[in-house]
């Protein structure tokens, strides 16, 4: 038996040796071997690739995922152009896709309209008479995607019961997105903060305010956002599930946070009746209560105004887009804006994403690819389950 086993082992080894040897998945030409891996492993592993594939003026990164993204942008444009290049049945999904794309590409019309498309919304904000109406109107506008509320609301998986969804409230309301931009004092952060102030002031001027008024409005918004930011959680704190999970009944929410008109907020936001809610970060929500109570109504309306204006910069005339891109250059380092067709594709994908996705899958994602991905996910789940069981 031992002799037979040895013979089989030798035979298998010989057969294996006769097979074509697989090459290494590591291409040393991409490495920078002059760098010590202990000092900068990333440059050690990919330094020469980075030298040979420099960033262009339009992108903040480079690599396979960037290439795939750009490939998909072109594919989506091809899909859209099928409907945008010829008349479609009125009211059909195809007509909506084509018309939206053509509108975004019509620079003559957009530049002629200027900020007229958002004037009715700004007029509605200006007409607000009291704080209760302010909360109602800003909730209605936020539901439309204007971003006018000082916190975020939505529905997501319960972090302690992933099989069920739950209504969630969390920090938000700051234009720069991250707390650090408001509280840190390093040179780069200060530069970003000043660029943001200049950006807001310019936008206020572009919708009819003189320089002094625009300056005053900018300062009012900055004061509100800084208050909220200082109370908000840092990026590190946001990683702690326990500190970001405060489940309660709706009735308890109303008791614990009385400074927010929750009934009108949820009604205006399209929520049906619900029993439970999770508050992610209590401190910034309490700070919003104080801001709503202590800030003048005019300054509150100014805050809502800038959210509407800033949110529309990508779909208004070219001068609004240019101002927004100047801020983007400071924050991201990108030196060249995306061409108009890419921005138009982005708008259509954002507004009619599910429809575009369905068409994309039918054209570019065959059943065989779906099976491969399902198998991959299944294998990943199995491997992770095994690791959890063995831990």
Task: Name each region found by the language model.
Residues 1-20:
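Bacterial Sec-dependent N-terminal signal peptides
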Residues 13-16, 133, 384-390:
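Short, intrinsically disordered, charge-balanced linker/junction segments flanking boundaries
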Residues 19-29:
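Short, Gly/Pro- and small/polar-rich lid/capping loops
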Residues 29, 33-37:
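A charge-rich, low-complexity, intrinsically flexible signal that marks solvent-exposed coils, linkers
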Residues 36-39, 44-109:
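Active-site-surrounding "flap" and adjacent substrate/cofactor-binding loops of secreted or lumenal enzymes
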Residues 83-374, 379:
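Noncatalytic, helix-rich "gating/capping" subdomain that lines the substrate-entry/channel surface
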Residues 373-391:
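Zn2+-dependent metallopeptidase catalytic core
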């Amino acid at each position: 038996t031992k002799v037979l086993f040895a013979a089989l082992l030798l035979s298998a080894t010989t057969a294996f040796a006769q097979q074509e040897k697989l090459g290494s998945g590591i291409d040393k030409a991409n490495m920078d071997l002059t760098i010590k891996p202990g000092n900068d492993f990333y440059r050690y592993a990919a330094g020469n690739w980075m030298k040979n594939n420099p960033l262009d003026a339009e992108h903040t990164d480079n690599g396979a995922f960037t290439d795939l993204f750009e490939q998909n942008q072109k594919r989506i444009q091809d899909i859209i152009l099928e409907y945008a290049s010829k008349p479609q049945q009125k009211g059909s999904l195809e007509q909506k896709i084509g018309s939206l794309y053509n509108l975004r590409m019509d620079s003559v019309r957009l530049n002629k309209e200027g900020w007229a498309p958002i004037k009715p919304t700004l007029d509605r904000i200006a007409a607000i008479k009291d704080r209760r109406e302010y909360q109602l109107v800003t909730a209605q506008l936020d539901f439309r995607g204007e971003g006018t509320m000082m916190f975020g609301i939505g529905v997501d998986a319960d972090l302690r019961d992933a099989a069920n969804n739950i209504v969630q409230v969390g920090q938000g309301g700051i234009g720069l997105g991250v707390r650090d931009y408001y509280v840190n004092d390093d040179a780069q952060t200060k530069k970003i903060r000043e660029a943001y102030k200049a950006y807001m002031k310019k936008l206020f001027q572009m919708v009819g305010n003189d320089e002094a008024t625009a300056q005053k409005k900018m300062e009012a918004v900055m004061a509100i956002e800084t208050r909220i930011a200082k109370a908000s959680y840092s990026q590190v704190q946001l990683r702690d599930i326990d500190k970001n999970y405060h489940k309660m009944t709706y009735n308890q929410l109303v008791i614990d946070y009385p400074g927010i008109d929750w009934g009108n907020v949820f009604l205006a936001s399209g929520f049906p009746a619900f029993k439970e809610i999770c508050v992610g970060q209590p401190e910034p929500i309490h700070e919003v209560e104080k801001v709503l109570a202590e800030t003048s109504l005019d300054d509150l309306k100014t805050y809502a105004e800038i959210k509407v204006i800033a949110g529309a910069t990508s779909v208004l005339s070219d001068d609004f887009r240019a101002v927004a891109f100047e801020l983007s250059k400071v924050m991201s380092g990108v030196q060249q804006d995306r061409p108009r067709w890419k921005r138009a594709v982005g708008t259509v994908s954002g507004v009619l994403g599910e429809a575009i996705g369905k068409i994309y899958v039918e054209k570019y994602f065959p059943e065989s690819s779906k099976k491969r991905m399902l198998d991959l996910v299944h294998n990943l789940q199995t491997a992770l389950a095994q690791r959890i069981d063995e831990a």
